[in-house]
Amino acid sequence: KAKAAILFEPPNERWELFKELYRGYFSTECPAAIVTRDWLKLGFQGDHPERDLRGGGILSLELINDFAARENHSVKDMEKEGNDFFFAVSSINISFFMKKFFHLQTLTSRADHDHRELCSRLALKNFCRLLLSNRNAYADLHRLFLLHLYHTIWMGLKRTGSNITLLNFNQAFDTLREKVIRTFNDR
């Protein structure tokens, strides 16, 4: 929960995480200021990747790095031309969803409470059980959610032959969200 509360504030020592991600994906050193159009190839929205983190905070970046290190072949597949999938932005969206859903977001006022975005007591209990049995459960869940979003949901939509683009991302993400809710509410 502590990491979920840390928002990303550049420039700082956390830029090293961006540089690590860059080295891992491009097999070369990252520009000193980390500003480069190369970030678009990893699914960021622009050449300043820190701008995409917003409410996801530093935890989002750590989860992107974890995923890229463990699933480098999947990242390269996600970013192939024609797949129209934005790896980094999708990962950040999943991170932010998990942060809110599993009650890890610091709420500053009653207005921040949108109970539709919070998991049920049963789902939270199931999540806590998982954390007790697996120290890396949070990162593992993020990885599984992102793989499922891409391979099953997104590529499934692409295989239907319809013209699926970034504009269909919310539809795909809603499908993932519904599956997560159903899964964690299962006894």
Model region roles, listed by residue range:
Residues 1-187:
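Extended acidic/polar regulatory tracts at the flanks of large eukaryotic scaffold/adaptor proteins
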